[in-house]
């Protein structure tokens, strides 16, 4: 939360599905120890940083461990009893310092379909609003507010959260202080003016966007773990104006620290109202010095992280929403997110390696064809070394170290494969075989750097999955053939006329939707802008105000955010927001 406070984020939503008192046993109260050591410190951090710690409950779930424990609407007696228990649970956290609440119905039974929305969700939200207003009026003996700073803003996520265009006029009956969460037309939806305008036209309310990005939960269905360090071109669409959204909430990765990169961009998007894709590209470029060492000035370490992150942008959505007719959406259910595209044009990783891979697959590569590729892999190798030697934030480095080690070995193997191929083409096959063996060992070693996935299963950390790694595999096959070495089946790849990514990385489609950490961003395009997840550790150096861009002076009034460990609670949902909102 402290980190987020530097960048104008203003809301952090606590909704961890692995906390049984959040959903499965929502009636249960926290122990005194839990209040003192878990809830109260987070509430205090939120109040101090101006990034409100919002406590959420999900009382409508009726499955698994929560079966039969849900909030009931079948009789008036049950409703009043459960409402009393709901208030008591919220009250326990309000007494501990919480100053805003949220009510979630996502992934739960749609009780509105059974009893009517006005008799269920609308009624609960109205009753909670009235109750909050009563608490706001309570005074201490000296006349001061008993719950100073208590907000009546309630974040509400409906059971049908994707919204595909139906009227849903009942949303108009929800109190105006309630913010309605939507994922943008599909589970892995986008923040776009088109969606927001449709929702507002049909419901009379602006949506609070919940974007499942940079969420990497669906790599639980892959043989490896990846980081999502880009994708703003697909998930944060330009063209929004003030009031388009009521907020933007991001679902980050299990790795909280690198999630700050997407969170930073969402806050920038919210406050600065991107009007072109170039705005997003500039935000991506700018983000690394801020997430690495809280400064507008790039360092050797942050530049190294940037060069690697350029090749770690893909997001697997598991095919939850079906195939998309989008050039950036691969048939293997992956958003490519401009992976290996250098927005500055200085290092054409995609162009150079795509051209080389075509020649490698066709068996036509010559010694002269390896020069530019060698520059690419050498640059990436140097980037990994520079970041390892100069990390600006130890927490960040610790969380992504397996990927840095992966890049160390992958680039070493690529350079040796190129050397072996050139030696073989020059006729020195014996030396080429020895060099090839060294390259093969380095490639195998690159898969030994593991990290726990969503289900706490250790898997190898990988990157460069669209362009960089497939080209290394093509180099292996070419070097093996030209040197007379034998390529193990595990590394042999079928030839393809397609020189870009052939999706053969063990991905499997899944229809399970993500449920990890959620953050949020809220801003001018949203009422308030916001969003971030990260570990609650003291920030690095004191932040330096970011210089304004020519198009806006918003850099100096950037986002507020929040920090919290999403690795300790892998199923945590968090939200953050930034921007001006009513002080009520």
Task: Please name every model-derived segment.
Residues 234, 540-542, 584:
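Exposed aromatic-hydrophobic patches
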Residues 1, 32, 108-285:
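Catalytic-core regions of glycoside hydrolase
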Residues 438, 444-447, 451, 473, ...:
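Disordered, acidic Ser/Thr/Pro-rich linker "stalks" and the adjacent N-terminal cap
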Residues 137-146, 449, 453, 460, ...:
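Surface-exposed intrinsically disordered loops and tails
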Residues 277-495:
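C-terminal functional modules
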Residues 1-180:
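Aromatic-lined carbohydrate-binding surfaces of glycoside hydrolases
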Residues 562-584:
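Trp- and acidic/polar-enriched beta-sheet ligand-binding modules for extracellular glycan
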């Amino acid at each position: 939360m402290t980190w987020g406070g530097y960048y104008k984020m203003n809301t952090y939503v606590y909704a961890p599905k692995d906390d049984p008192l959040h959903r499965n046993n929502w009636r249960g109260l926290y122990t005194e120890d839990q209040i003192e050591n878990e809830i109260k410190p987070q509430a205090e951090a939120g109040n101090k940083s101006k990034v409100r710690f919002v406590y959420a409950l999900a009382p409508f779930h009726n499955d698994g461990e929560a079966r039969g424990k849900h909030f009931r609407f079948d009789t008036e007696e049950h409703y009043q009893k459960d409402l009393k228990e709901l208030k008591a649970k919220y009250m326990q956290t309000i007494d501990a310092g919480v100053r805003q609440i949220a009510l979630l119905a996502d992934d739960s039974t749609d009780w509105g379909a059974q009893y009517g929305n006005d008799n269920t969700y609308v009624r609960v939200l109205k009753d909670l609003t009235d109750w909050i207003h009563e608490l706001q009026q309570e005074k201490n003996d000296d006349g001061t507010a008993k719950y100073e700073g208590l907000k009546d803003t309630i974040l509400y996520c409906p059971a049908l959260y994707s919204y595909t265009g139906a009227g849903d006029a009942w949303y108009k009956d929800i109190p105006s202080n309630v913010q309605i969460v939507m994922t943008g037309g599909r589970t892995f939806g986008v923040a776009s003016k088109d969606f927001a305008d449709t929702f507002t036209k049909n419901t009379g309310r602006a949506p609070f966007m919940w974007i499942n990005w940079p969420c990497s939960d669906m790599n639980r269905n892959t043989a490896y773990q990846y980081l999502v360090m880009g994708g703003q071109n697909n998930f944060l669409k330009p063209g929004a104006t003030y009031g388009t959204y009521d907020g933007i909430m991001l679902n980050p990765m299990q790795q909280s620290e690198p999630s700050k990169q997407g969170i930073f961009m969402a806050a920038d998007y919210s406050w600065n109202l991107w009007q072109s894709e170039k705005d997003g590209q500039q935000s991506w470029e700018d983000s690394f010095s801020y997430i690495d060492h809280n400064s507008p000035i790039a360092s050797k370490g942050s530049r190294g992280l940037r060069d690697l992150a350029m090749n770690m942008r893909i997001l697997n959505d598991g095919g939850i929403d079906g195939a998309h007719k989008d050039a950036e959406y691969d048939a293997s259910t992956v958003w490519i997110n401009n992976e290996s595209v250098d927005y500055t044009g200085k290092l054409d990783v995609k162009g150079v390696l795509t051209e080389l891979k075509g020649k490698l697959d066709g068996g036509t590569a010559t010694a002269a064809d390896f020069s530019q590729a060698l520059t690419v892999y050498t640059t990436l190798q140097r980037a990994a070394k520079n970041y390892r030697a100069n990390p600006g934030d130890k927490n960040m480095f610790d969380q992504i170290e397996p990927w840095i080690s992966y890049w160390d070995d992958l680039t070493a193997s690529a350079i040796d494969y190129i050397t072996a191929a050139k030696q073989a083409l020059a006729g020195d096959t014996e030396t080429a075989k020895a060099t090839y063996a060294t390259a093969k060992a380095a490639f195998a070693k690159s898969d030994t750097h593991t990290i726990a996935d969503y289900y706490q299963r250790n898997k190898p950390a990988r990157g460069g999955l669209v362009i960089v790694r497939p080209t290394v595999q093509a180099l292996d096959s070419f070097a093996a053939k030209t040197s007379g070495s034998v390529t193990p089946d595990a590394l042999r790849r079928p030839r393809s006329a397609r020189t870009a990514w052939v999706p053969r990385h063990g991905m499997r489609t899944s229809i399970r939707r993500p449920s990890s950490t959620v953050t949020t961003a809220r801003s001018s395009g949203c009422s308030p802008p916001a969003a971030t997840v990260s570990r609650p550790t003291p920030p690095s150096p004191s932040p330096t105000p970011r210089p304004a861009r020519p198009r806006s002076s918003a850099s100096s009034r950037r986002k507020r955010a929040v920090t919290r460990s999403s690795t300790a609670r892998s199923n945590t949902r968090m939200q953050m927001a930034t921007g001006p909102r009513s002080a009520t």
